[in-house]
Amino acid sequence: MKVVIDNLGVVKHATIDLDKNILLFCGPNNSGKTYIAYVLNALLSQSPVLRSVMNNAVMKDQNGTTYTINITKELIVEYLKLASSYLQQNMGSIFGLSEEMEKSFFRSFKLECIYDDADYKRFFNDKFSLYYQADDRKYNGRKAKNSSEITIEISTM
C-alpha cells in the first residue's frame, strides 16, 4: 500500500510505500519526518473508523465470544477512504491544536491511500495471529494462509 501526503507543513509531497520491510525517515531537523510518522500512526490506528466499517462485516457465534470477519479488498478500501477523510478533518487532534490553528495549518492537507490487487493478494496469502488485552478481556485473533477471514475470540480474565 502506498500513502500519498500533500501539504503537510514543510512536506509539499511525499509518497510512502508501506510494503517495504522497514521505513526509515531521515533528513535535517524540521523537514517533516515527525509529522509524516504521526500521520501514518494515526491512519493505521483509527479505532473508531475501523469499528464503524467492521460492524456490517462481523458474524458472531451463538455465545457472542467468537467473531469472524471476512476482509475483502472493498472493505479495506472503504476503511482507508474513511480513515483518510477522518484524518483530514481532525488533524488538530493528532497534533494537539485548536480548531482555529488546525484550519490555518492544515487547510490544504491531502491524504490518499493507494491499495491495489497486489496488496490484497499479499494480505490473502499471509498467515498471522494477534493478541490484545484491555481491562478484563483478552482478544486472540488469527488468520489462516490463503483466507480472507479473521477469527477473533474474546475471553474474560
Kindly give the residue locations of the regions a language model identified.
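P-loop NTPase switch/coupling surface
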Residues: M1-M157
